Amino acid sequence: MAAVAVLLVLIGAMAGWLGWHTFRDTQTQRLHDLFLQTGRQGAVNLTTMNFEHVDADIQRVLDISAGAFYEDFQKRARAFGDVVKKTQSMTEGTITEAGIESISGDSARVLVAVAVKTSNLAAPQQLPRLWRMRIDVQKIGQIAKVTNVGFVA
């Protein structure tokens, strides 16, 4: 009888341990997915602009941004929008690849490859440009925001 009780305790402990690890792995995967999706969306928002609704496009970038990147982009938004309108620029970014470079606590660095189609008054049809971006993302509450953007050579 005592052996059965010990066996049941061991089985319960093992089930609890496996359950905890499964839960932790699921949470880690969700965080990974959140960081990756935010990095991808940040790249699309930054590379997709249209002079006809550039103010809404700029707001999309601001909505997914935080920290120093948000402040810097907000300061430059009016001048940027004016240039986009003046040149009648249209850009459309398409993600070709994306992956997590590193994760540390509530932040991650995401590498994103983007093909960007561009047209404007001076050059109506241009070949797509291929950009590689390094996007820093931070979890704030239940969402993640872009905190820094750089280009990879």
Model-derived regions, located:
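Surface-exposed, charged secondary-structure patches
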Residues: 88-119
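A short, acidic/glycine-rich surface segment
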Residues: 44-45, 118-123
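Amphipathic, hydrophobic N-terminal targeting peptides for secretion and organelle import
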Residues: 1-24
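Short, low-complexity Ser/Thr-rich regulatory SLiMs
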Residues: 9, 102, 137-141
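Core segments of small alpha/beta cavity-forming domains
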Residues: 30-86, 90
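Short beta-strand edge/turn micro-motifs at domain boundaries
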Residues: 109, 125, 130-153
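Aliphatic-rich helix starts adjacent to a transmembrane/signal segment
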Residues: 25-29
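A mature extracytoplasmic/lumenal domain signature
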Residues: 77, 112-116, 150-151
